[in-house]
């Protein structure tokens, strides 16, 4: 039978999603876990690759497993075989023809940008020009097959953090990070709003800057033929882990801010 899982991970601890020899990747640790529950060769399909430093909340994978071993294909069993910073938290029995990659109707990414003085109205105006079907050549390292359709872009801010939600039928390499990089320059006044129209012209000789990977997260992937069952125990356990992690990172942020304050005192 075919099983689909929603998985999440903290990307700054991995060298990306895709398996690479000698490097710690999300695919490699997931493959090892699936091998141990009896998935042939640990093989699975995934909704999309994420680069080094990029996290996920709603990555989706699917795999085949013999029916007499399907009782092992549940989040809490698989999580016992995974590092604590990668976890499955929802499960669905998938139809025979389902593919986490090819059956996806849309994907949604969220980017968190610290920019307390950004002009949200300018950013939202520029973002509106990106919705629809365009050639995003200037928003990617790729130079072939660069036409994509963005369904929506929402931009909000809270306590100095600007949150970009971008939903599209599909993305090309670095597309979201370059969209954020371009919108940030517009928001801080280094570029006019109309600059986004220049970037949408594939003949423009310059591309958009790339925002750092750590602020990016794969939020969700949409399908028409799955009924997800969330694992309550996993969500409770992971919530405790994330609270501890958030406290640790908040404390480290305080350390860095104090270092910055003292260094600035010298000039």
Curated annotation (Swiss-Prot):
Residues spanning the signal sequence: none
Highest taxon in the source lineage: Archaea
Example GO molecular function: tRNA pseudouridine(38-40) synthase activity
Pfam families assigned: PseudoU_synth_1
Catalyzed reactions per annotation: uridine(38/39/40) in tRNA = pseudouridine(38/39/40) in tRNA
Residues that bind substrate: 109
Function: Formation of pseudouridine at positions 38, 39 and 40 in the anticodon stem and loop of transfer RNAs.
Name by which UniProt lists this protein: tRNA pseudouridine synthase A
Source organism per UniProt: Methanothrix thermoacetophila (strain DSM 6194 / JCM 14653 / NBRC 101360 / PT) (Methanosaeta thermophila)
